[in-house]
């Protein structure tokens, strides 16, 4: 790619002393748009719930505003981290993530919600540790690929070794239990290894093994099997196992093309469980109709496109770690948003996955914003490399 082309596509240039930060304005605009859109919809979906739980209609909107501010701070902090520093500590971060997964399973430390022990309290904020592990897993796999690219491309061992370490995290996630996060982590890793050039037959074989393992896990856990059966025919038991899905489908049916109007949802009024978190997309479909739901899908498609484009730019600049980290973040966010929306629309069995940047929650918001911040850093370093500025042309990092 020519220097002239890079200069024309470098986006917003922020200056700080002698340093510069090359900001992706498209990614910034779309990310802020999703956060603002999510805040409006969380407010709409939770006013009645706040009144019931805390005698304050704006209880959840006020907390979500704090979550957004914390997320912006996390994104700012992540954008300040030098990529070589992150790569150097990628293995340590991975084992720190494993330690968090162990910590949450210790009685008295992990917090149980709806029968799952997935949260710990950090500085007054309830954090879902699986969200943190998704990011550190992507960082670890990117670091592994940058160190062992030839092995990944030529040897079965090159794929099995990182997946075997991730399997440790998968086992701990399943103990919570969190099957959805397990699927996202493993699928993201497989996607990154595939993009690294792993042999097709090895990739297909491992994909088949993962699929078989997933099937076994479904059939050996009654609650997972019940979710799959209710997905196949939610109307067979609409008041029990199929309740969430049937209520979500009713929400989309009521929304039709243009929706019933912002704030006018009926399903959010104690019919649709987790309307402000996992099933926020159903409220969007009901209140804003097909056009609102399609807008959200397009915004997430742009986020994934920018992540992959940033990864390609970093790969051309010669920074493999940055490239595959961007690819991993793109796969993760795209897959998680697809699963969440698919569950809401009845395309997939029910999973406990949030809609990135939109659903209510502080831990998820901070982690996803940190991932977006890393994308900004990756792009800035890649553009600086093409412009010949090197480290001297960047904002100072840690």
UniProtKB/Swiss-Prot annotation:
Domain of life: Bacteria
Reaction(s) this enzyme catalyzes, per UniProt: [GlcNAc-(1->4)-Mur2Ac(oyl-L-Ala-gamma-D-Glu-L-Lys-D-Ala-D-Ala)](n)-di-trans,octa-cis-undecaprenyl diphosphate + beta-D-GlcNAc-(1->4)-Mur2Ac(oyl-L-Ala-gamma-D-Glu-L-Lys-D-Ala-D-Ala)-di-trans,octa-cis-undecaprenyl diphosphate = [GlcNAc-(1->4)-Mur2Ac(oyl-L-Ala-gamma-D-Glu-L-Lys-D-Ala-D-Ala)](n+1)-di-trans,octa-cis-undecaprenyl diphosphate + di-trans,octa-cis-undecaprenyl diphosphate + H(+)
Pfam families found in the cross-reference section: FTSW_RODA_SPOVE
The keyword Isomerase belongs to this UniProt entry's keyword annotation: no
Broadest EC class assigned to this enzyme: transferase
GO biological process terms, semicolon-separated: cell wall organization; FtsZ-dependent cytokinesis; peptidoglycan biosynthetic process; regulation of cell shape
Keyword list, A-Z: Cell cycle, Cell division, Cell inner membrane, Cell membrane, Cell shape, Cell wall biogenesis/degradation, Glycosyltransferase, Membrane, Peptidoglycan synthesis, Transferase, Transmembrane, Transmembrane helix
A single MF term (Gene Ontology): peptidoglycan glycosyltransferase activity
Gene Ontology cellular component list: cell division site; plasma membrane
InterPro entries assigned to the protein according to its UniProt record, in alphabetical order: FtsW (IPR013437), FtsW/RodA (IPR001182)
Subcellular location: Cell inner membrane
Transmembrane segments: 21-41, 58-78, 93-113, 122-142, 154-174, 178-198, 200-220, 290-310, 319-339, 356-376
EC number per UniProt: 2.4.99.28
Periplasmic membrane side: 42-57, 114-121, 175-177, 221-289, 340-355
UniProt topological domain (Cytoplasmic) ranges: 1-20, 79-92, 143-153, 199, 311-318, 377-398
Biological function: Peptidoglycan polymerase that is essential for cell division.
HAMAP family cross-referenced by the UniProt entry: PGT_FtsW_proteobact
Family: Belongs to the SEDS family. FtsW subfamily.
Protein name, entry field: Probable peptidoglycan glycosyltransferase FtsW
Organism of origin: Methylococcus capsulatus (strain ATCC 33009 / NCIMB 11132 / Bath)
Gene this chain is encoded by: ftsW
């Amino acid at each position: 790619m020519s220097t002239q082309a890079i200069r024309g596509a470098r986006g917003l240039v922020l200056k700080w002393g002698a340093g510069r930060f090359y900001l992706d304005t498209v990614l910034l605009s779309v990310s802020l748009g999703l956060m603002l859109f999510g805040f409006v919809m969380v407010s709409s979906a939770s006013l009645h719930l706040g009144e019931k739980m805390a005698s304050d209609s704006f209880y959840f909107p006020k907390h979500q505003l704090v979550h957004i501010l914390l997320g912006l701070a996390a994104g700012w902090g992540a954008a300040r981290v030098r990529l070589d520093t992150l790569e150097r500590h990628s293995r340590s971060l991975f084992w720190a993530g494993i330690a968090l997964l162990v910590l949450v399973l210790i009685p008295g430390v992990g917090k149980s919600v709806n029968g799952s022990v997935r949260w710990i309290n950090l500085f007054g904020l309830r954090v879902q540790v699986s969200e943190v592990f998704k990011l550190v897993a992507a960082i670890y796999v990117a670091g592994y690929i940058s160190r062992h690219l030839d092995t990944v491309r030529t040897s079965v061992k090159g794929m099995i070794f990182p997946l075997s370490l991730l399997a440790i995290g998968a086992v701990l996630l399943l103990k919570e239990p969190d099957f959805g996060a397990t699927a996202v982590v493993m699928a993201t890793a497989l996607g990154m290894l595939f993009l690294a050039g792993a042999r097709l037959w090895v990739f297909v074989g491992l994909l088949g093994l993962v699929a078989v393992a997933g099937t076994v896990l479904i059939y050996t856990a009654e609650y997972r099997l019940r979710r799959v059966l209710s997905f196949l025919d939610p109307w067979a038991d609409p008041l029990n196992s199929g309740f969430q899905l049937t209520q979500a489908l009713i929400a989309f049916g009521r929304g039709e093309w243009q929706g019933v109007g912002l704030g006018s949802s009926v399903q959010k009024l104690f019919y649709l469980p987790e309307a402000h978190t996992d099933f926020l997309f159903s409220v969007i479909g009901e209140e804003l109709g097909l056009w609102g739901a399609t807008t959200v899908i397009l915004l997430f498609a742009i986020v994934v496109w920018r992540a992959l484009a940033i990864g390609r730019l970093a790969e051309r600049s010669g920074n493999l770690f940055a490239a595959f980290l961007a690819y991993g973040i793109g796969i993760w966010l795209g897959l998680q948003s697809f699963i969440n929306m698919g569950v809401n629309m009845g395309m997939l069995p029910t999973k406990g996955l949030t809609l990135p940047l939109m659903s209510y929650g502080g831990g998820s918001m901070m982690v996803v914003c940190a991932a977006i911040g890393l994308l900004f850093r990756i792009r800035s370093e890649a553009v600086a490399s093409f412009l010949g500025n090197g480290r001297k042309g960047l904002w100072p990092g840690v």
